[in-house]
């Protein structure tokens, strides 16, 4: 995603996939004002830990299903069933809340709100993808928004940054779009870049990304 992940007024550009394979995931995303609110809360951590590998704010997202590296030919068959799924699912009311870490290496913010519906959506997304014959790693769905990763030997920074988010409670917002996203993870030493392959309005079917 070279443009920001916005569920309401995002300006994602659908780009052709030029490689033989692409790394793919399905996600929701908070709107700009919710991201700005969290970014302000992260101000002290940004200042104290500049060496952490901070994700770009415009790329913040909530992963529903990580499909891994797929042949580009496996992507088009996903579009029709995901269109149908999005059309029958209602938007979700969510909020960003608190913070934590995975193994003192990955910093994240938590998700609250319509969690039962969020888990249901993630389960249905994964089932639809598998019905298309796409096999991907089975991971327990733990709703979160990844913010940063620690440098080797600097795990204390992640723990400290997570503690700084303990009291954060963001405003509620509506997750109204489902995103099919490609990334360049593992394709060189540069920063991770994302692009939207397609996006669908929940409850209203598909429209151009």
Task: Give the label of every model feature segment.
Residues 2-209:
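Histidine-dependent nucleotide/RNA phosphoesterase domain, centered on the 2H-phosphoesterase fold
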């Amino acid at each position: 995603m070279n443009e920001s992940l916005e569920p309401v007024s995002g300006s994602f550009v659908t780009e052709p996939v030029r490689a033989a394979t692409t790394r793919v995931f399905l996600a929701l995303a908070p709107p700009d004002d919710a991201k700005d609110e969290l970014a302000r809360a992260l101000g002290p951590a940004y200042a104290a830990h500049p060496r952490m590998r901070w994700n770009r704010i415009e790329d913040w997202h909530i992963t529903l299903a990580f499909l891994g590296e797929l042949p580009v030919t496996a992507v088009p068959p996903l579009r029709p069933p995901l269109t149908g799924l999005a059309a029958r699912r209602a938007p979700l009311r969510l909020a960003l809340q608190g913070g934590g870490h995975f193994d003192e290496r990955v910093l994240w913010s938590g998700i609250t709100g319509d969690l039962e519906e969020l888990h249901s959506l993630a389960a249905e997304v994964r089932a639809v993808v598998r019905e298309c014959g796409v096999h991907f790693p089975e991971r327990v769905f733990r709703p979160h928004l990844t913010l940063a990763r620690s440098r080797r030997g600097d795990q204390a920074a992640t723990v400290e940054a997570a503690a700084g988010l303990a009291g954060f409670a963001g405003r509620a917002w509506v997750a109204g779009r489902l995103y099919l996203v490609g990334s360049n993870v593992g394709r060189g030493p540069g920063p991770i870049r994302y692009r939207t392959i397609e996006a669908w309005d929940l409850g209203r079917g598909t429209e151009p990304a």
